[in-house]
């Protein structure tokens, strides 16, 4: 069974833990208890393949930023979460993305942009703004509500699909390199 290491990143209070717990335990956590770092595992079937999701729920608080490099190194894919009622959390996405690319030493890291709290009546981040940002990054965008469960499975499952596409692309590139290295050199 394939295991996928997913990491949930974003500013404090955007609902990273609420999304993760909604996926794993099917319930909404109402009270805010800042996370230092929690790990969850769940077996799911995505597109007919049984797989194990190993989800790292991270601290959004700045005082824990030193821990980020470590979990970014081990993660295969990242849910970059902001709250639709918090413009600053949306602006912070750029910093998380840059840090992930730096730590992974790659421009091409599987990510999904997630706009959480879409059940709230007032929003300060427009859907189009988020779609445009995701398009500029070349990643999917999904709106979620940890409270109503809207889009929760979709966000995590889309990330797994992004990781699969990335692995497929990497293995194709690896095969191309191997083919090239088998050509014979003739000296005259």
Curated annotation (Swiss-Prot):
Q: Which residues carry this modification: Cysteine methyl ester?
A: 185
- Stored PROSITE patterns: RAS
Motif position, Effector region? 32-40
Subcellular localization: Cell membrane; Cytoplasm
| Lipid attachment site numbers (S-farnesyl cysteine) | 185
Activity regulation, free text? Alternates between an inactive form bound to GDP and an active form bound to GTP. Activated by a guanine nucleotide-exchange factor (GEF) and inactivated by a GTPase-activating protein (GAP).
Q: Which residues form the propeptide?
A: 186-188
Pfam families xref list: Ras (PF00071)
Q: Which residues cross the membrane?
A: none
What function does the entry list? Ras proteins bind GDP/GTP and possess intrinsic GTPase activity. Plays an important role in the regulation of cell proliferation. May play a role in promoting oncogenic events by inducing transcriptional silencing of tumor suppressor genes (TSGs).
Report what the protein is called.
Answer: GTPase KRas
Q: What is the originating organism of this protein? A: Cyprinus carpio (Common carp)
Provide the organism lineage as a comma list: Eukaryota, Metazoa, Chordata, Craniata, Vertebrata
Gene behind this protein: kras
């Amino acid at each position: 069974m394939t295991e996928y290491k997913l990491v949930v990143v974003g500013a404090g209070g955007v609902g990273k833990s609420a999304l993760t717990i909604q996926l794993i335990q099917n319930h909404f956590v109402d009270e805010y208890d800042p996370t230092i770092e929690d790990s969850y595992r769940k077996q799911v079937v995505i597109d007919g393949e049984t797989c194990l999701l190993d989800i790292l729920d991270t601290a959004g608080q700045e005082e824990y930023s030193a821990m980020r490099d470590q979990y970014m190194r081990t993660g295969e894919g990242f849910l970059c979460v902001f709250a639709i009622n918090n413009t600053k959390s949306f602006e912070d996405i750029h910093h998380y993305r840059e840090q992930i690319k730096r730590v992974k030493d790659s421009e091409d890291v599987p990510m999904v942009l997630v706009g959480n709290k879409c059940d709230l009546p007032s929003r300060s981040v427009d859907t189009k703004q988020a779609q445009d940002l995701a398009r500029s990054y070349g990643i999917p965008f999904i709106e979620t509500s940890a409270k109503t469960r809207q889009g929760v499975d979709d966000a995590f499952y889309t990330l797994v699909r992004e990781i699969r596409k990335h692995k497929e692309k990497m293995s194709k590139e690896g095969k191309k390199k191997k083919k090239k290295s088998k050509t014979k050199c003739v000296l005259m």
